[in-house]
Regions:
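Long, well-ordered mid-to-C-terminal structural blocks that present hydrophobic/aromatic surfaces
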Residues: 199, 205-230
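Short beta-strand elements that form the blades of beta-propeller/WD-repeat-like
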Residues: 64-86, 117-148, 178-193, 225-236, ...
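Exposed beta-sheet edge and beta->alpha loop/turn motif
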Residues: 1-29
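Surface-exposed loop/turn elements that mediate protein-protein interactions on large endomembrane-trafficking
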Residues: 28-57, 83-109, 140-172, 192-212, ...
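Repeated scaffold domains used in trafficking and secretory/extracellular systems
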Residues: 59-67, 104-121, 167-182, 212-224, ...
Length: 274
């Protein structure tokens, strides 16, 4: 639920609150075994949000999804389902992406079954990022999937590069999305969704499917996400060949056993394949 209060500057402040109760019932009474409450402030980007070299995000968890450009002069961060960008030299704060409007908070806009992952940020402050989960509004409203966006900081414009629909729930997507996400210096972006590996050229916006139908039990990903090893989905428990792709070159190498051996990827030790 949402709570609101009037801040010191007279502006309305909004907070998303979640409560967790663990109870046990008997024939005679009810016991409260555990209670937890979390509160996250909906960042509004008001004038008092910046103090010296700090951005005051308000009440929230200490784990902030953020990235800076190489010089450290531009920082982009995620707060309660919104993406923001702050330019230290210009002392400007921009809301890059949000499903919410600027006046108040309603249930449709504030439905929190989505999240944002920052892919990269260049020296000019332009950002590539993905929005995944349930789409609250826009042309994909009511669907679940992954949208890849590019924000041009000079023009202050957002462009959707590709939308990948998904049959998974937001919670499943959230747990699986971190499995594979890799960006090359040339601007190629790789991501795995629903067992399919997609390659997206962030310059031309071309999208292709590299691998389809992967099973979790027959996939291994290196620590940097640069390498992916897998066996054919049709032979998960009886394959004599492991395929391994290097996303920096898209080169595929096959590792084979003897005629009577089956092979299976176990994992990586950093970048070394096991």
């Amino acid at each position: 639920y949402v709570v609101t209060r009037v801040g010191q500057n007279g502006q309305s402040e909004y907070y998303n609150v979640e409560e967790y109760y663990r109870v046990r019932y008997t024939n005679t009474r009810m016991y409260l075994l555990n209670f937890e409450r979390t509160m996250e402030e909906i960042f509004r980007g008001e004038n008092d949000s910046i103090s010296g070299n700090s951005i005051l995000l308000g009440i929230r968890s200490k784990d902030v999804e953020y990235q800076t450009n190489e010089s450290g002069k531009v920082v982009t961060f995620v707060q309660e389902g919104e993406l923001w960008s702050y330019n230290q030299e210009a002392n400007t704060l921009a809301k890059v992406f949000s499903f919410r409007g600027y006046e108040g908070v309603d249930d449709r806009e504030n439905y929190g079954e989505h999240d944002i992952k920052i892919v990269n940020i260049d020296e000019a402050g332009s950002i590539d990022y993905i929005v995944y989960g349930y789409m609250n509004r826009g042309i994909h409203e009511g669907t679940v999937g992954i949208a890849v966006y590019h924000y041009d900081s000079l023009a202050n414009t957002n462009e959707e590069q590709v939308f990948i629909p998904s049959s998974q729930s937001y919670e499943v997507m959230k747990s699986e999305l971190g499995q594979l996400m890799y960006v090359t210096e040339s601007g190629a972006f790789y991501i795995m969704v629903d067992g399919n590996v997609y390659g997206i050229d962030l310059n031309s916006l071309d999208t292709k499917v590299l691998v389809e139908g992967l099973s979790d039990e027959a996939v291994a990903i290196s620590e940097s996400n640069r390498f992916l090893a897998w066996v054919d989905p049709s032979a998960v428990r009886g394959s004599d060949t492991i395929h391994m792709i290097d996303f920096s070159t898209e080169k595929v190498t096959d590792v084979t056993g003897s005629a009577s051996d089956y092979v299976k990827p176990l994992g990586f030790m950093q970048e070394d394949f096991v």
